[in-house]
C-alpha cells in the first residue's frame, strides 16, 4: 500500500492547497484539564481555570492560542474575541496571545465544548468552542478509517459580532 509504506516518510497534508486562504495550522490535542466531557459540566469549577476558558461579558469562551507575531498582524490582543474559521465552519474563541507557538501555528483543545450556534445551525458561527467543526471529515488514507481531526488549516480574525458564516458544501471522501 503506497499510502502506508514500511518506512515512514513525509507526505504533505491533503489540505495544503488551501493554505493561501487559511494560512494558520490549528492543532487540536486532547484537553489538559478534563477528559472529553467527563467532569466538565460547562458550568463547573473548570470554567475558573484561566487556561481553559475566558469569561467575556458573562460568557465563558473557549481559548485559541496564537503566536504573538501572527496576532499582531491581525490586530489581535490578549482575550479578544476572535473568529476561527475555514470552509467548514467558524468558531468564536478568546485569543491567548503567546510566543510558545511557532509562527503559523494555533492551538486549541479539541473537546469539552458545547455546540452553541448563534444562528442557523451549520450556517452560523459557534460560540461554544467546538473546534472539531473545522477539522477534516475525510479519512487520512483511502484504505482505512483513520481520522484526521487533530489538525486543520484556518484563518483567525477579530470577531465582528455577526452570526452568519457561509460553509462550503460537504464533499464525499475520496
What role is predicted for each listed range?
Residues 1-50:
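Long, low-complexity segments enriched in small/aliphatic residues
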Amino acid at each position: 500500500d503506497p499510502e502506508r509504506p514500511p518506512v515512514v516518510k513525509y507526505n504533505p497534508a491533503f489540505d495544503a492547497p488551501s493554505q493561501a486562504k487559511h494560512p494558520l495550522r490549528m492543532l487540536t490535542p486532547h484537553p489538559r484539564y478534563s477528559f472529553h466531557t467527563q467532569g466538565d459540566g460547562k458550568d463547573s469549577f473548570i470554567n475558573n481555570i484561566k487556561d481553559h476558558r475566558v469569561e467575556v461579558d458573562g460568557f465563558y469562551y473557549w481559548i485559541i492560542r496564537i503566536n504573538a507575531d501572527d496576532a499582531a498582524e491581525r490586530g489581535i490582543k490578549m482575550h479578544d474575541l476572535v473568529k476561527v474559521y475555514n470552509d467548514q465552519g467558524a468558531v468564536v474563541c478568546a485569543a491567548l496571545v503567546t510566543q510558545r507557538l511557532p509562527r503559523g501555528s494555533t492551538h486549541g483543545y479539541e473537546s469539552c465544548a458545547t455546540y452553541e450556534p448563534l444562528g442557523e445551525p451549520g450556517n452560523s458561527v459557534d460560540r461554544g468552542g467546538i473546534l472539531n467543526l473545522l477539522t477534516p471529515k475525510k479519512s487520512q488514507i483511502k484504505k482505512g478509517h483513520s481520522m484526521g481531526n487533530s489538525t486543520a488549516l484556518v484563518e483567525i480574525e477579530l470577531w465582528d459580532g455577526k452570526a452568519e458564516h457561509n460553509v462550503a458544501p460537504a464533499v464525499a471522501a475520496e
